[in-house]
């Protein structure tokens, strides 16, 4: 950059960029450095605010190529006489004259000439953040002009100035704004003086450099605390006390430090960034990276003053890049080292193969025939006991390959058999080596590992899905290390070499799972039982409260240990550790025990599986208070059920299933359905107990519940048993397929059509998938094809499992359905879901030929039985809604929908003509109406009733509209519902017209379209005002009942203009009623309606003109007919009169529930006490009592 004619106050952006590019050759910086240039100085302005280029690449020296900035400025002023304020502000900010710029900003604000540059700078808190590290030289020399300033409250003052200036509150007077601005300006000036005082105090409190060096020379001596540090620590300590509820201690602490404001961090000092709280500082004390200065070798005795000037100003990003590069280089070196090891192993193995081949030939010629036969027998084994694969690649038992042993390639077998003789030969030649005892011990233990295989017939897919619930993980680097166990001391050394680099930097940071491979290897190979027990104790107590990932690592290690040492040592060494932790105070440790029981189940002796482990889990399920522990217990019990083969344990398994289903935690019940029940059902299938014991036991318990529930059914237990039956449906269907007559003809062929996606309901877990139970999706496709063909063409002769379902199971469950309470929507819904899943699982052919005929035989919907009410009693039971919603809705084709419509029409007709209760039809409409897909279908059924010739059927259709309106969208209400109701409201039969009133009321309650509301309002008005209805007692009863039900939730205008005036008229007319029975009926309904409406907002005019007069008329009736009601009415009238007299209180409390005073004096006192707590203004108080819409 040319220095002679530079005007620092008049340089364009483009010129600035060009000059920066020219100067960039001297001090080249990376993009990351430029991005963080912001942090070089605590007050350096943001990049967008620089009007000119930096005068030098060194930001701390305001000179241009050796020419001082002042000279450049003078030459610029001489060349251009007028300088803009913005350029002056930019120069002040660039030279770090922050206080001067602050005073200029204040002066300009007072003059009304605010600079956007200064406003943006001083309103940005990021410009006032302190650097993380301050060079010692700066500390010793004091704070210079560009040094950091102690932050005070002036920033908020400037922000408030800006807020006041741009306030849009037009109601304030100009003098008020002037007063506010003067106050803020005065506050800003006081803050400026306080800043200067803080700077002076900070400079005076600095310790002399010689004294500081004396402290540094003695490591035992600590520097005296500085005032700034004391204030910061005081603030953090007080904050900790408040967060942890030590309020009295905090108050005492604040009193003892009355010179400090603990409410505001800025009181500690200007430009001091707030550190984390004490707890975070304590947790991070071991994680903090040492400062760059601390890395200087002490032996060299480097003094900070001797370091280069830019030593402490290097960007943190450069340090990070260096660290990352070093780490990457270490990784590359480690990989190269491993590659070299593998190459050397490859060469050595090739030489060994050649040597072995020659040795084998020599042995065959020279040794005896007995030894030769022994070697051949060893070679002939598919899985040799003394094989010795390559040191680092094959000396491990990998739990990830346990389920894939059948898929080993011929190449692997060949290479394994090739190395057998070498291993045996080496064993004979290494007997004199120092560690031969350890090696022989390891090989002996490996060769003797055999596990008890249960006598079970689970499909591989089901077995693998069951084991997936054992929470093990070998996907990560550490998981792969844990899942492999070394066989010899040489492999241990290799593992130590891999694991120690990860352990050393992490063990102090709660990364203790890195120790698991070392602990397991040592525990496997150590010859002393006490030491092994101690190591396993350390493993289970390694982490105080292990999280999910840490528990998975420990479990993976336990499984690898079990695979290596065998069932005897697992029982003797691992199980005692689990037993010790079973009552641990931390739930995470108990959770580890519960998960370990399931993970170790395949590697335990079968006697232990079915006795000790089962008892441990049963105790934890019954006693543990943590939901997550019981959930893990249930999953482990499911795994145990996949391995248990003792038939005597069936009853214990059944009790465990009931105990799990009755657990109060939803997550435990969910785990029971997902894991335990499918596994238990698979065992019952092998025992032959699924159809003979398990399902009949659940049905018996349901029947017992129904017998005991005459005075109240335990719906929770009914749901528990029925949900268990529902979870058993896939297993039951799998039994049918596996025991079918066509099983001998099953062949996997390519021409079998694939299974439709919607063929089966979505399973709750993989264990409930029929394909998993059977073995594979291809095999299931073949079985389904033969199953449908058998049902459709060949019949069920000899198919015992299917005949049991058709002849025993279905009749019993249908009989149970007929005995449940139809008014219980929960029971109806549960049984509907059960039949829906049953029919979807067993298929459409089974549903049409086996399920529907049994329901149709029971319901008997023929016209001949219309008058025989005794024969149609079943139509009033829950059988109707469950058949309609659980069976007829399984398949959604056109013929299925027609069948459903016809059934509902027949039920509606039969019930209406038989004068039977409509509860079963209502339950059907409620259950189907919850699904919008059936709204059109239900409307079709109701229209059939609207146009029916019988008035009874039309009455039923009118009442069904009330149930349907709430769930139907307003378009259907306008197009289908309202026209049908209008048609019925003009019916010749008065009973049909009366039946439409509840539906009209529900429309007024739920619909928002004004046109619809007006049509309904006109129809209701015709009922009330038409002379032909004046003596219709039933109509008046229905209208009053409807008003009381929908009035509180209806549109306010409808309530005020229609409901309250007509209730007043009805009450007045009831005073002239001569028939006492009718009068008491109307009066009772009016009392209920007025009690419901008293909780609504009622204006003073309505209160005087309609509400109070109606109450007085009603009181007149109650004085003669019901004195106890008259007392309540008198209290209501008195309170309303008080409200009318006191208008102010009436406006504030217009929506107070009048009925609150009727509940009792206690409720009234509580309500008034709440009112007394309100300290808001009248406008806000009015919002509390909003009009209810």
Swiss-Prot record:
GO terms for biological process: intracellular cholesterol transport. Residues 19-36 have a biased composition (Basic and acidic residues). The keyword Membrane does not apply. Disulfide bonds: none annotated. Residues 1-65, 123-154, 374-453 are annotated as: Disordered. Residues 124-134, 426-453 have a biased composition (Polar residues). Keywords: Coiled coil, Endosome, Golgi apparatus, Lipid transport, Repeat, Transport. The gene is relch. This is RAB11-binding protein RELCH homolog. PROSITE patterns: HEAT_REPEAT, LISH. It is found in: Recycling endosome; Golgi apparatus, trans-Golgi network. GO terms for cellular component: recycling endosome; trans-Golgi network. HEAT repeats lie at residues 574-612, 613-652, 977-1015. May regulate intracellular cholesterol transport. InterPro entries: ARM-like, ARM-type_fold, HEAT_type_2, LisH, RELCH. Residues 172-205, 326-373 form a coiled coil. Residues 404-425 have a biased composition (Low complexity). It comes from the Eukaryota. Residues 229-261 form the LisH domain.
């Amino acid at each position: 950059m040319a220095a002679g004619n530079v005007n620092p106050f008049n340089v364009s952006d483009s010129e600035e960029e060009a000059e920066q590019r020219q100067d960039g050759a001297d001090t080249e910086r990376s993009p990351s450095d430029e991005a963080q240039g912001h942090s070089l100085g605590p007050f350096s302005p943001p990049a967008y605010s620089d009007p000119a280029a930096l005068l030098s690449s060194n930001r701390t020296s305001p000179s241009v190529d050796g020419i001082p900035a002042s000279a450049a400025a003078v030459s610029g002023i001489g060349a251009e006489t007028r300088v803009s304020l913005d350029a002056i502000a930019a120069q002040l900010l660039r030279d770090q004259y922050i206080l001067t710029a602050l005073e200029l900003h204040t002066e300009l604000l007072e003059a009304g000439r605010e600079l956007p540059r200064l406003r943006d700078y001083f309103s940005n808190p990021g410009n006032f953040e302190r650097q993380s590290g301050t060079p010692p030289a700066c500390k010793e020399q004091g704070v210079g002009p560009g040094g950091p300033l102690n932050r005070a409250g002036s920033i908020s003052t400037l922000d408030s100035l800006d807020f006041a200036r741009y306030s849009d509150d037009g109601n304030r007077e100009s003098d008020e704004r002037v007063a506010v601005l003067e106050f803020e300006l005065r506050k800003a000036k006081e803050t400026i003086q306080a800043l200067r005082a803080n700077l002076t105090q900070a400079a005076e409190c600095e310790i002399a450099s010689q004294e500081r060096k004396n402290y540094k020379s003695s490591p035992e001596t600590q520097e005296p605390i500085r005032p700034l540090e004391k204030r910061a620590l005081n603030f953090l300590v007080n904050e900790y006390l408040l967060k942890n509820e030590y309020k009295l201690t905090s108050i005492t602490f604040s009193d003892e430090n009355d010179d400090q404001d603990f409410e505001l961090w800025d009181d500690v000092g200007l430009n001091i960034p707030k550190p984390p709280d004490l707890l975070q500082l304590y947790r991070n004390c071991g994680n903090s990276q040492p400062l760059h200065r601390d890395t200087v070798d002490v032996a060299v005795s480097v003094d900070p003053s001797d370091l280069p000037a830019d030593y402490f100003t290097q960007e943190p990003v450069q340090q990070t890049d260096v660290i990352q590069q070093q780490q990457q280089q270490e990784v590359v070196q480690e990989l190269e080292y491993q590659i070299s090891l593998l190459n050397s192993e490859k060469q050595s193995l090739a030489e060994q193969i050649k040597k072995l081949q020659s040795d084998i030939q020599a042995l065959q010629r020279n040794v005896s025939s007995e030894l030769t036969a022994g070697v051949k027998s060893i070679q002939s084994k598919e899985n040799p006991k003394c094989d010795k694969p390559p040191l680092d690649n094959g000396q491990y038992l990998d739990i990830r390959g346990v389920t894939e042993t059948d898929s080993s390639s011929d190449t692997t077998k060949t290479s394994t058999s090739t190395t057998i003789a070498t291993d045996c030969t080496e064993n004979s030649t290494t007997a004199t080596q120092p560690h031969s005892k350890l090696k022989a011990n390891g090989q002996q233990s490996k060769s003797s590992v055999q596990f008890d295989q249960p006598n079970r017939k689970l499909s591989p897919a089901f077995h693998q899905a069951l084991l997936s619930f054992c929470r093990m993980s070998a996907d990560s680097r550490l998981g792969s290390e844990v899942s492999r166990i070394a066989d010899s001391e040489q492999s241990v050394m290799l593992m130590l070499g891999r694991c120690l680099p990860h352990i050393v930097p992490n063990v102090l940071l709660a990364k203790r799972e890195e120790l698991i491979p070392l602990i397991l290897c040592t525990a496997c190979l150590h010859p002393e039982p006490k030491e092994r027990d101690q190591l396993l104790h350390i493993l289970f107590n390694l982490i105080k409260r292990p999280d999910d990932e840490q528990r998975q690592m420990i479990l993976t290690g336990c499984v690898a240990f079990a695979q290596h040492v065998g069932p005897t040592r697992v029982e003797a060494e691992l199980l005692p550790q689990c037993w010790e932790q079973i009552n641990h105070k931390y739930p995470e440790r108990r959770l580890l025990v519960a998960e370990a029981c399931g993970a170790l189940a395949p590697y335990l002796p079968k006697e232990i599986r079915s006795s000790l482990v089962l008892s441990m889990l049963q105790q934890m399920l019954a006693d543990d208070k943590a939901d997550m522990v019981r959930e893990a217990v249930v999953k482990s019990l499911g795994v145990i059920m996949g391995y248990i083969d003792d038939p005597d344990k069936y009853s214990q398994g059944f009790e465990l299933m009931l105990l799990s289903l009755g657990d109060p935690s939803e997550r435990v019940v969910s785990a029971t359905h997902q894991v335990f029940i499918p596994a238990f059902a698979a065992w019952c299938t092998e025992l032959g107990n699924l159809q003979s014991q398990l399902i009949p036991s659940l049905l018996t318990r349901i029947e017992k519940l129904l017998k005991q529930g005459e005075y109240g059914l335990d719906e929770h237990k009914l749901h528990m048993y029925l949900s268990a039956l529902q979870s058993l449906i896939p297993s039951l269907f799998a039994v049918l397929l596996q025991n079918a007559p066509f099983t001998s003809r099953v062949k996997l062929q390519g021409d079998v059509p694939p299974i439709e996606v919607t063929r089966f309901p979505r399973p709750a877990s993989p264990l409930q998938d029929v394909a998993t139970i059977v073995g594979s999706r291809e095999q299931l496709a073949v079985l389904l094809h033969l199953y449908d063909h058998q049902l459709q063409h060949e019949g069920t002769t000899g198919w015992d499992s299917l005949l049991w379902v058709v002849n025993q199971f279905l009749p019993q469950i249908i009989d149970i359905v007929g005995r449940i309470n139809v008014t219980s929507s929960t029971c109806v819904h549960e049984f509907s879901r059960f039949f829906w899943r049953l029919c979807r699982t067993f298929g459409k052919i089974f549903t049409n030929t086996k399920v529907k005929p049994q329901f149709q035989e029971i319901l008997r919907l023929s016209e001949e039985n219309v008058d025989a009410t005794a024969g149609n009693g079943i139509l009033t039971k829950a059988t109707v809604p469950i058949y309609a919603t659980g069976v007829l809705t399984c398949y959604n084709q056109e013929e299925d929908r027609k069948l459903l419509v016809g059934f509902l029409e027949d039920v509606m007709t039969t019930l209406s003509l038989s004068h039977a209760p409509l509860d079963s039809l209502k339950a059907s409409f409620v259950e189907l109406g919850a699904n919008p897909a059936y709204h059109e279908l239900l409307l079709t059924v109701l229209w059939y009733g609207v146009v029916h010739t019988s008035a009874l059927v039309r009455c039923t259709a009118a009442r069904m509209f009330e149930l349907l309106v709430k769930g139907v969208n307003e378009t259907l209400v306008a197009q289908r519902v309202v026209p049908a109701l209008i048609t019925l409201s003009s019916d010749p039969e008065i009973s049909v017209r009366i039946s439409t009133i509840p539906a009209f009321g529900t429309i007024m309650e739920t619909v928002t379209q004004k046109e619809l509301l007006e049509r309904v309002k006109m129809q209701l008005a015709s009922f009330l005002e038409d002379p032909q209805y004046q003596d219709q007692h039933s109509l008046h009863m229905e209208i009053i009942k409807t008003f009381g039900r929908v009035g509180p939730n209806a549109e306010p205008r409808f309530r005020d203009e229609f409901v309250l005036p007509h209730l007043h008229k009805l009450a007045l007319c009831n005073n002239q009623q001569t028939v006492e029975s009718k009068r008491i009926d109307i009066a009772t309904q009016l009392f209920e309606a007025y009690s419901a409406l008293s909780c609504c907002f009622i204006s003073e005019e309505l209160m005087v003109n309609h509400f109070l007069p109606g109450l007085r008329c009603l009181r007149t009736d109650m004085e003669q007919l019901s004195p106890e009601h008259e007392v309540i009415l008198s209290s209501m009238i008195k309170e309303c009169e008080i409200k009318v007299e006191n208008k102010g209180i009436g406006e504030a409390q217009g929506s107070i529930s009048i009925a609150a005073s009727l509940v009792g004096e206690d409720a009234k006192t509580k309500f008034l006490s709440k009112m007394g707590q309100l300290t808001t203004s009248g406008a806000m108080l009015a919002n509390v009592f909003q009009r209810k819409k």
